[in-house]
Amino acid sequence: MMQVRMQAEPQQLTLALSKGRIFEETLPLLEAAGIKVTEDPETSRKLILQTSDANVRVIIVRASDVPTYVQYGAADFGVAGKDVLLEHGGEGLYQPIDLHIAKCRMSVAVKDGFDYASAVQQGARLRVVTKYVQTAREHFAAKGVHVDLIKLYGSMELGPLVGLADAIVDLVSTGSTLRANQLVEVEHIMEISSRLVVNKAALKLKRERLQPILEAFEKASKRSS
């Protein structure tokens, strides 16, 4: 009796992205790998987007959730900011490439006129609002600054203006939002850019499909850096 050998289905890959700047700046990297996203998440209500490659799809998630989707295998790979990865901890993730996209910086800012340097020098205990609690805690601990951290999910600039906090820790790109709210940067914490993150199991099981995409991303990111 002749045995019929079934041909294996191509391995589908799922890429996790967040809307906005990271999505827009990832598109050229995908195109360098020969992949085009066929739908716009800004105009579509769909959370799963198809691409020109039938075996690659994109899921749209919150920026802070990208590492979690990749960690647990709901996505094979994703793009996330260094800020998000530091808060997540990076467990279960392979981070092979700094893509040099969505660049900004993480800084401490205060209301214009607040003498931050003197407060720190005098050992004052400062209240700080941020959504980057883990990173802020490590930063201030390393400097020996006493702080009470308050976690917010947005509108950090409002904190010092209404007396909720003395300072904020947030991402800064041009600084225009700070200036519009009479805040000034007083301390630079780190430079931020977005990284490619890959599920460790997927890297082993789907290496043949993933490797060409990873290589294309790396080459394209080097050209743009």
UniProtKB/Swiss-Prot annotation:
Keyword Cytoplasm listed? The answer is: yes
Q: Top enzyme class of this protein? A: transferase
- One Pfam family of this chain: HisG
According to UniProt, the reaction catalysed is: 1-(5-phospho-beta-D-ribosyl)-ATP + diphosphate = 5-phospho-alpha-D-ribose 1-diphosphate + ATP
Q: What pathway or pathways are given for this protein in its record?
A: Amino-acid biosynthesis; L-histidine biosynthesis; L-histidine from 5-phospho-alpha-D-ribose 1-diphosphate: step 1/9
Q: Which CDD domains does UniProt cross-reference here?
A: PBP2_HisGs
**Could you cite one Gene Ontology molecular function of this protein?**
ATP phosphoribosyltransferase activity
Per the record, its GO cellular-component terms are: cytoplasm
Compartments where found: Cytoplasm
Q: Which terms under GO biological process does the entry name?
A: L-histidine biosynthetic process
Q: Which domain of life is it from?
A: Bacteria
Description of how the protein assembles with itself and partners = Heteromultimer composed of HisG and HisZ subunits.
Q: Could you tell me what this protein is called?
A: ATP phosphoribosyltransferase
The organism encoding this protein is Herminiimonas arsenicoxydans
Q: What is the lineage of its organism?
A: Bacteria, Pseudomonadati, Pseudomonadota, Betaproteobacteria, Burkholderiales
